């Protein structure tokens, strides 16, 4: 949440009186179908401009215990592609994850968001004012270095290390979820890296000078 707060403050400061949208993405996630992802983001923009805090939920294709889940509620403003959020759920065990997937009511929490900068600041003011105040102080006297903004580290270090989910999204009445199915992965494990990598006829992902015999569905990597 603190890093997003800095981005929101900087965006508002540099927007010449406008209220920009922030698309919050993780630097290390994988999206196979970028065109489809852009289409989903564009469909969510009118809702974000209305003040909704959009989180993108990945349509699950298997019971996954490594992700948090979001339970969908009723449709938003009569559209068929966005839903109010019933609840956020921590990483479940396999049986519970299978129950979620089979129900069709749950999506994976991707950790990707879209909202107006002012909407985020307003909600942060309600639920985590200490984070907002520390970030504001860290921006006082900040210097620009090429494309970077160098903040005051001593003030920023006062921020609590809360994720945006815990700080805002699980509390705000403005949170909604827009499902997406774009070949997403957070590449958070060796198995997920295997899933998104090119495989040979035996299902092996091989990189480097490798000799394999009667092996299937492996991830084998060497610099040799």
Model-predicted regions and their roles:
Residues 68, 111-115:
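Short glycine- and hydrophobic/aromatic-rich loop-to-beta-strand nucleating segment
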Residues 3-6, 10, 43-46, 69, ...:
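Alpha-helical scaffold segments in soluble metabolic enzymes
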Residues 1-76, 122-127:
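Conserved beta-loop-beta/alpha segment of the NTase-like Rossmann-fold superfamily
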Residues 115-224:
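Left-handed beta-helix
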Residues 22, 86, 105, 112-113, ...:
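A residue-level structural signature of the nucleotidyltransferase/glycosyltransferase Rossmann-like core
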Residues 103-106, 110, 126-129:
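An anion/pyrophosphate-binding glycine-rich loop and adjacent beta-alpha core
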Residues 25-27, 34, 57-60, 73, ...:
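Fold-independent oxyanion-binding glycine-rich loops
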């Amino acid at each position: 949440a603190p890093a997003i707060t800095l981005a929101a403050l900087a965006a508002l400061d540099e927007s010449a009186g406008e209220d920009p949208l922030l698309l919050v993405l993780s630097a290390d996630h994988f999206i196979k179908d970028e065109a489809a992802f852009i289409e989903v983001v564009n469909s969510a923009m009118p809702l974000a401009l209305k003040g909704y805090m959009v989180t993108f939920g990945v349509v699950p294709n298997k019971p996954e215990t490594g992700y948090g889940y979001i339970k969908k509620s009723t449709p938003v403003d009569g559209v068929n592609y966005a839903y109010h959020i019933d609840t956020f759920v921590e990483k479940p065990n396999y049986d519970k994850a299978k129950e979620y997937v089979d129900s069709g009511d749950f999506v994976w929490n991707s950790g990707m968001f879209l909202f107006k900068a002012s909407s985020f600041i307003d909600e942060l003011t309600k639920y985590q004012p200490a984070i907002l105040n520390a970030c504001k102080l860290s921006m006082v006297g900040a210097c620009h270095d090429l494309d970077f903004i160098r903040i005051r580290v001593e003030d920023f270090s006062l921020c609590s290390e809360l994720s945006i989910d815990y700080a805002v999204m699980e509390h705000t009445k403005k949170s909604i979820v827009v499902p997406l199915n774009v070949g997403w992965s957070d590449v958070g494990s060796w198995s997920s890296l295997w899933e998104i990598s090119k495989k040979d006829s035996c299902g092996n992902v091989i990189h480097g000078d490798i000799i394999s015999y009667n092996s299937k569905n492996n991830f084998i990597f060497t610099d040799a």
